[in-house]
Amino acid sequence: MKEKTPLDAIKTIENQSSVEDLYSQLTDLSPKIVTMFTPSNRSEEEEGFLSGEVRDPQFYYEKLNSADFDEAAEKIQEIGNKILNHPSLPPSHRGIYEEFIADYSKKTTLLNYAQQYNNAKSEEEKKAAAEKYRYLNIESYGEPDEDTYRSLLGGKLNAIHSKKLTGKADELRKELFGMVNFKPGMDIPERFRPSDETVEWMHSVAESLYGGMLSHIPNEQEEFDPYELQKIFTDIIEEEFNNDSKGYAGAAEGWTVSAEKATSVNVKSSEKRIVIPDNGMMRSRKKVENLVVHEIGVHMLRSITGGETDMLPLRSGLSDYYDAEEGLGVVMEQALSGKFAERGVDHYITAGLAYYDEKDFRGAFEVKWRLSLLDSVRDGGEINDEQIEKAKKTAFTQTLRSFRGTNDIPLFKDLSYYNGSVEVWRYLESIKGDDFLLSLLLAGKVNTSADHRRVILESKSA
């Protein structure tokens, strides 16, 4: 065999895809859990469930059940190995890429287990798939803390118990207390909250950072449909990012906004795309402001700033970044209003109902709509059919978010809203107004750990 010459080695390197090209191929294989876990038959199942025709919805997941996750896992490993063995990859970057590739593999396997559960031909197969799914779900997203769950639920139940209710409201309260384990006057442990000084500091940050973006929301309008929201987002991307010569200067080139079938507004960083559900939902001005801050001002912005470095995973998210990603979005919404309020409580309670109280979809739903409705009623307040219908629709959506993918097993992905907001507020409290340390949190998709801060500090402009 002819021995390779230095010239042959040079030609081999020239013919190799770059790390950036390989990374782009890898992110094309991103485990799209939100997309895969979107039911194809939601409207029909929702109608039958809310009318009482069926006890439990049987959602069908067309994209999930037809995907080839074994092939996807093989490609992730193949491309991942090419990146890790690439001559242009700095040795100091290797560990970050290893964690990133491992996370993609883990999330792809989680989708595979959900598919196996849905397509199981026997109870034995279903049980085996369920066990594997539950384990990897907790490994990926954590599990609800029981003390926190009991505290959050107990706080709401104590408040409802102390209200002076009559008629239909009192009847619903009795029904609710018959569904949950509640002891009047139960001790509620104190939970973390940031100081007023930290909230005020973040309020000034939000006003400065997002003032230009929010100026694109028409002043004279109070409600917005999906296509009006699409235009607002598109205008912000063009004017505040691409045409801003002093600021981001074209950093959002290639980013688009579409209105299409979806369950929620979703930033798809790997595709440079923001998706808005085309379901006709009208959103208030306040809700649109929060979406601008959360979706563009956090999710999209951190992807753009991370993409401007030589550490490509900062564009998509380092390992274990997700809680802080959603947490920062929630924190910035609160910072804009200048008021702290616990967020993600409803998601946390749904997870706790399913995990600790073993409620199925119907069981969790029946608790949630009563809890939400009675939480909003004042002393002596009346409850009408319209309020009940609205509460049921909201509870259905929230319960679906928790049980999506399998219909039976709670997905803990949405714990990030509560856990992440606490993580970020604790971090902000600890840095006490340090704008530089705050800027590191906006410089890519990272969490609040010292390890992630070090990655940001050691990265270089691309």
Tell what function each PLM region has:
Residues 1-150:
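N-terminal helix-rich structural modules
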Residues 90-94, 223, 282-287, 315-319, ...:
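Short, charged/polar micro-motifs that form catalytic or ligand-binding hotspots
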Residues 94-283:
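Contiguous, non-catalytic segments that form substrate-binding/exosite surfaces or channel walls
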Residues 284-289, 293, 320-325, 391, ...:
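Secondary-structure capping and boundary motifs in well-ordered enzyme cores
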Residues 285-286, 301-326:
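Post-HEXXH active-site segment of zinc metalloproteases
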Residues 292-301:
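Active-site His/Glu-centered metal-binding helix of metallohydrolases
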Residues 315-359, 420:
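Post-HExxH zinc-binding segment in Zn-dependent metallohydrolases
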Residues 343-462:
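Conserved alpha-helical "signature site"
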